[in-house]
Amino acid sequence: MKNLLLMTLLVLSSFSISAKQILLGPNSNSQEEIQEALIDLEPGDVLTLEPGEYFFEDGISLDVDDVIFEGSGIDDTILHFGDQVSGAQGLLVTSDGVTLRDFAVLDAKGDAIKVIGADGISMIRLRTEWTGGPKETNGAYGFYPVESKDVLIDGCVAIGASDAGIYVGQSQNIIVKNSIAQYNVAGIEIENSYYADVFDNLASHNTGGILVFDLPDLPQQGGHHVRVFRNKAINNDTDNFAPEGNIVGEVPRGTGIIIQANSDVEVFDNDIYGNGTVNLSIVTYGYETDDENYNPHPKSIQIHNNRFGDGGFDPDVGTGELAAILFELSGGDMPDIFWDGILPMNQILFGQPDDEKLVISNNGDATFLTLNPIKYLLPFFDPVERDIKEYEGQVRPLPEVILN
């Protein structure tokens, strides 16, 4: 036992002795110095940037496991990419166990911070921003971890992305918390991902506040087990400025939360108001696809104990189809919660399994609208249903996400 303890202490001691802390300040050669330092890091090292402004003409990248890359504060260490001429990202991370914290990435040519294939990535107190306001020439994503596991985004700020400010795609075990997303097309988006907790965030002045999407033709699909709670999805009022062809280009201005084609999603204890088209929508993926493995229908969605306020007062009927269809169906009396009512044909005929049914419970005076698909297909019937009480049911809380 003593020998084992001694060996452990020796290993820890050698690790701490070999780990380095590198401190760099701004100068005319910052691009080369920082990239060289990122290449030369070894596991356990910490690279710290002093307060100041750092200017880049190329993207920078990190491919070393178990390191920390940090600045001296979200408003104090500023990485400027406004003159970037090469690289699809400001910062690209392709390694495991990395922590990024306490700096800002401004005006990247493409995505601000992209992480690919990481087993453990922590982004803490970071800011990504395009400083010229909402424009389709802005980069697509602020925070962009994809194909990763154990993703933490905590205390971050995302402003001005032409797709999503905070986006996590094709990943699993995800926490997005204590963050602010403003003036993006999508504020926060969880796409084709498994086990995500999104909580204590502010999503405001975006086109759409919080999106939980699942799309076809991707290696990982069938998004499931997403909890959205204690957020403020409020006052999302920015015109859609996504480049033509982007899926989020269909999101109407004034959308609080959209759930599309996911299963096992729990939305609770949120403040949702000030969204001019609709506060919350649950919709089927509406495009044809040749992907035989893809299920376009949302199921096992639970909406409970939220606080809804004014919504639907300025529907964006000119963007996509959602707002125009909803406006027509509702006669202009837009609901707080909308479900398109579309089900697989066998469920239209024989009913949904109980554990897949939509549950809406304890949302105050929230209003509701859905379609009866059979009545919608037949003439002389009103397909619109508004009785929210029919969807009261037993809430089955989803498990908390715990990162490894």
Describe these PLM feature segments.
Residues 32-40, 55-64, 69, 114-117, ...:
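Short, T/G/N/S-enriched strand-turn elements that build extracellular solenoid repeat scaffolds
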Residues 31-34, 57, 81-91, 107-114, ...:
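Extracellular beta-strand/beta-solenoid scaffold signature
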Residues 2-8:
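Sec-dependent signal peptide recognition
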Residues 9-18:
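Hydrophobic h-region of N-terminal signal peptides that target proteins for export
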Residues 70-75, 96-107, 119-132, 149-162, ...:
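Right-handed parallel beta-helix
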Residues 288, 293-404:
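Acidic, glycine- and Ser/Thr-rich low-complexity intrinsically disordered tracts
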Residues 20-32, 46, 66-109, 132:
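Right-handed parallel beta-helix/beta-spiral solenoid domain characteristic of secreted/periplasmic
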